[in-house]
């Protein structure tokens, strides 16, 4: 975790990068007037919901698609750091201890349906992700759990957010950013209630109904009428949803009510990754591909395309189900002893990853996290695995987000290595998203990135991503619960001192490698493939991917 001064320096640098991409795209359109009207963009996985804050939504490719339809007080730039979005509003520090922040939404901020963006949306985001209100299927409580209260007058543009004493979250800039603020008036209109009043007064029956709609009302399904799309999926950004196609693609069009700089390209169709990417690249029917490296096999780059491979902030890992054959730590450790982590990482072209609580960055803290404890799980040891099971056979079902050639090969590698230990590993096809399949007991292990994601899955913050193993957190898919680890994760969120963070990580590592809720494999690598005629597309290691600035993209005809 970088100290605060360094983080501010990187944010300033990102503003320069953003300006450069804007100049490049503007130069194309202003000088030549030849920008294409449409771009086709392929992302990691299914687009199942507009609400990327649910467990399923956070693990999907939704953040890649909707970073510029649902804006917030910041967005994640090309290095994964949060950049202030002053088009949306401003954040000011009122007091440092306890931490008190004032959030001021732009007077011009309005949804595509004509309704104003208000502090009610902040109250809903906090309530859904704070862990205080039952029923919300939120992916994470990180940061929001430390908010003591929000002062908001319904319908107004300003909110004061007060944190619990001694809980001054270091990465508070991660809160209320792009894709985190859902339009609360959609729920208010359906229930005919004052959502903010119901939440702040903790009206139990109303909260139950609000949570139910927050979880499901923004599910993306083909066949919705134009009026329903307009009313249910309003946008607060440069793009808005026009339609959902039968094959799951989402069509975005320029939002004529957007109050900032207008989108350069008028239409972007966002496609879930399919098995036909190579064919689509060969026939030039796709302009930008933003997926996990190796997921499409040996993707050949034609002369008319350019390709960049780079590390994400997410960790590819085995996430063990809380029930079934791997419910006990003994059997999880046995499986880990026969997983060839060295060979799997080598196939991905990267070192083995060991960190669970400092996963988002490559630095000295991350490199040291769990390194000593992980040594016994670095190479295949089928004899030790067999002994750990007492010679009892074990069957393990592993699932993953399809299609993904690299993960399919990984499961095959694990199956071959574990067979001598009496462990039968099978590759299981499921008809539900990976996190749901794990919850439902359809698989014993989910092979995925941070939070069960098909893509990066990372927030870009080590402290925030560590909540994946905090009890009660939605994307704690293994159902892991350990009071000591909860305390360490909580302490990491409010500490910027490298020495203290190193101490906390060293305390956690022996516990986590003994209880084995997950098995980290390697840092997920990304492939960004684009037409040589594309302008202003840049990489991003977080779950928002290349879509973080899609309103600046331009395709030369």
Swiss-Prot record:
* Secretion signal, residue range per the UniProt entry: 1-30
An example Gene Ontology molecular-function term: peptide transmembrane transporter activity
One GO cellular component term noted in the UniProt record for this chain = plasma membrane
Q: How does it sit in the membrane?
A: Lipid-anchor
Q: Which InterPro entries match?
A: SBP_5, SBP_5_dom
Lipidation, S-diacylglycerol cysteine type:
31
Cystine pairs = none
- Biological-process GO terms, alphabetical: peptide transport
* Cellular localization per UniProt: Cell membrane
Keyword Lipoprotein included in the entry's annotation:
yes
Keywords assigned = Cell membrane, Lipoprotein, Membrane, Palmitate, Signal
Q: Which Pfam families match?
A: SBP_bac_5
N-palmitoyl cysteine: lipidated positions? 31
Q: What family, per the record? A: To M.bovis Mb2616c and M.leprae ML0489.
Q: Protein name, please? A: Uncharacterized lipoprotein Rv2585c
Species this chain originates from: Mycobacterium tuberculosis (strain ATCC 25618 / H37Rv)
């Amino acid at each position: 975790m970088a100290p605060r001064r360094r983080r501010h320096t990187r944010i300033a640098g990102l503003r320069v990068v953003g300006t450069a991409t804007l100049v490049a795209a503007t130069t194309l359109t202003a000088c030549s007037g030849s920008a294409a009207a449409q771009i086709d963009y392929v992302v990691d996985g299914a687009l199942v919901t507009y609400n990327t804050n649910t467990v399923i939504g956070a693990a999907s490719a939704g953040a890649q698609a909707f970073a510029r339809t649902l804006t917030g007080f910041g967005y994640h730039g090309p290095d994964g750091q949060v950049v202030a979005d002053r088009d949306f509003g401003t954040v000011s520090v009122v007091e440092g201890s306890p931490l008190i922040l004032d959030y001021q939404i732009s007077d011009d901020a309005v949804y595509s349906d004509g309704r104003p963006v208000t502090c009610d949306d902040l109250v809903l985001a906090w309530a859904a992700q704070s862990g205080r209100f039952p029923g919300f299927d939120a992916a994470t409580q990180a940061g929001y759990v430390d908010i003591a209260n929000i002062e908001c007058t319904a319908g107004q543009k300003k909110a004061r957010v007060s944190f619990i004493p001694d809980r001054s979250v270091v990465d508070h800039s991660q809160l209320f950013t792009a894709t985190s603020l859902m339009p609360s008036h959609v729920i208010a209109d359906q229930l005919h209630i004052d959502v903010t009043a119901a939440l702040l007064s903790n009206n139990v029956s109303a909260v139950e109904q609000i949570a139910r709609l927050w979880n499901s009302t923004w599910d993306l399904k083909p066949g919705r009428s134009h009026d329903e799309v307009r009313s249910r999926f309003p946008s607060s950004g440069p793009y808005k949803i026009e339609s959902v196609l039968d094959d799951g693609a989402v069509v975005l069009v320029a939002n004529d009510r957007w109050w900032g700089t207008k989108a350069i390209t008028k239409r972007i169709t966002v496609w879930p990754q399919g098995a036909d990417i190579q064919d689509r690249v060969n026939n030039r029917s796709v302009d930008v591909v933003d997926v996990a490296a190796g997921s499409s096999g040996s993707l050949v780059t034609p002369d008319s395309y350019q390709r960049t491979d780079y590390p994400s902030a997410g960790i590819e890992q085995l996430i063990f189900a809380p029930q079934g054959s791997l419910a006990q730590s003994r059997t999880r450790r046995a499986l880990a002893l026969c997983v060839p982590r060295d060979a799997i990482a080598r196939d991905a072209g990267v070192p083995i990853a060991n960190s669970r609580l400092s996963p988002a960055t490559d630095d000295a803290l991350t490199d040291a996290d769990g390194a000593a404890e992980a040594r016994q799980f670095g190479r295949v040891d089928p004899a030790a695995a067999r002994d750990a099971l007492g010679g009892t056979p074990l069957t393990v079902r592993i699932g993953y987000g399809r299609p993904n050639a690299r993960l399919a090969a990984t499961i095959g590698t694990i199956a071959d290595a574990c067979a001598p230990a009496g462990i039968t590993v099978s590759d299981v096809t499921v008809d539900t998203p990976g996190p749901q399949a794990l919850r439902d007991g359809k698989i014993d292990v989910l092979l995925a990135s941070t939070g069960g994601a098909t893509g990066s899955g990372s927030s870009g913050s080590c402290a925030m991503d560590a909540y994946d193993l905090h009890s009660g957190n939605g994307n704690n898919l293994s159902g892991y619960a350990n009071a000591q680890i909860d305390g360490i994760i909580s302490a990491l969120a409010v500490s910027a001192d490298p020495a203290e963070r190193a101490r906390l990580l060293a305390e956690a590592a022996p516990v986590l490698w003994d209880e084995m809720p997950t098995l980290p494999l390697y840092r997920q690598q990304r492939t960004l493939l684009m037409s040589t005629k594309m302008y202003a597309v840049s990489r991003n290691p977080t779950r928002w991917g290349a879509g973080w600035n899609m309103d600046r993209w331009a395709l030369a005809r």
